[in-house]
Amino acid sequence: KNELRRTYSGVIYPGRPHEFISIANEQMPDASFSGEGNGRFVLLTSRLPYEIESQWDISQKMDTWIYDMQSRQLVEIAKPVPGRPQISPSGNFTYWWNASEKQWHAFDNINRRTINLTAEIPVNFWNEKNDTPGKPDAYGVAAWGQDDRFVLLYDAFDIWKIDPIGKQKPENITKNAGRADSITFRYINTDPDKRFIEPKDL
């Protein structure tokens, strides 16, 4: 009944008020718009193929696409993405935690390639104290940088600055002080209107 009443996201371009473009649909019902609704990319996902399977398998799986508002092209990222994909603030990347691999991944929405963000870092990004039957969650994402130039990821103690393109080496911005002294560093955003973190704030 709820599905029958469901509405789907679309857009109307400025200057073309009578042209409505449907973005989401029955096959890809969930849409996340980048840039506070004004970005180039839209993340589309669907859990529908895995609803029955989810009754015994609690791991997240979603078929995932990116819609390019400029070219009006739909690009498939994966069927399924093993996780809960999200779109970065400026919309340049789709990212997710792969609980099976215990790694963070990102899909470059512009160049259309997937990058393992944490494979070369010699610490665990998964919750080492996980005591549930399911696969462990990540410690989380602290913030993205301006224009999605970097992402800050947590391990158990420290914060890592990672280039989602993969050109710059990962940097432990807390200098391993957290792990050395068993102190947990976390980023607290005191400005609710702030969508990203600037390099000067690090």
Protein language model annotation of sequence segments:
Residues 1-202:
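Beta-propeller folds
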